[in-house]
Amino acid sequence: MACLWSFSWPSCFLSLLLLLLQLSCSYAGQFRVIGPGYPIRALVGDEAELPCRISPGKNATGMEVGWYRSPFSRVVHLYRNGKDQDAEQAPEYRGRTELLKETISEGKVTLRIQNVRFSDEGGYTCFFRDHSYQEEAAMELKVEDPFYWVNPGVLTLIALVPTILLQVPVGLVFLFLQHRLRGKLRAEVENLHRTFDPHFLRVPCWKITLFVIVPVLGPLVALIICYNWLHRRLAGQFLEELRNPF
């Protein structure tokens, strides 16, 4: 009001200009950090990418950028002084993270987590720090089993398919050999009846068939048993690795 009463318009204009300049300087370093806004989904053993950016966009090459998790603010990945600070990472993330910096000059970065584990599921916090000013954004990672949509009964059936496919041709071979051996044994028995006394052969026909078939099918049955054992063992190891990759 003093300016109005004294009609000192140049001094009023200069005061207003200085005020605007002071306000612009105080807000020059401020920005907002924006996350994806929705849960990021990844399969166990696969890769997950967590995007993060600042608004308004600006060159973040000289800033400190990082991700951490609660509790105890465990460092997932940290970028400072123009390079990654791997030594400050939590042990469970060492060698498994990568900061994609192709668009860091625009204020956009992405954290890539490799070989995702079930323990990686949960909340993450991304932050940008420019000197003493820092802003953060929260995001969530959901980890899913590759076979989460499959009923356990279906998994059991899938595991048994190779065994069934092997046993079908084995059964056909068994029936074929049984038919051939029966015909051959019947002819030999008839010849023996013609040559020797009928009372000489008192051994039942099924026993003769058994004595001939067992030496033929014995190794085949052993092979089937070994295959089933090996298949169950490998299937168990595969499912265990899916649940506990490390």
Swiss-Prot record:
UniProt entry tagged with the keyword Disulfide bond: yes
GO cellular component: membrane; myelin sheath
Residue intervals annotated with topology Extracellular: 29-156, 231-246
Entry membrane topology: Multi-pass membrane protein
Cellular localisation: Membrane
Gene Ontology biological-process entries: cell adhesion
Signal peptide bounds: 1-28
Residue ranges annotated for the Ig-like V-type domain, each copy included: 31-144
Cytoplasmic side: 178-209
Primary localisation category: membrane
Disulphide bond pairs: 52-126
Membership in a protein family: Belongs to the immunoglobulin superfamily. BTN/MOG family.
Subunit: Homodimer.
PANTHER family hit by this protein: BUTYROPHILIN (PTHR24100), MYELIN-OLIGODENDROCYTE GLYCOPROTEIN (PTHR24100:SF71)
Name the UniProt record assigns to this protein: Myelin-oligodendrocyte glycoprotein
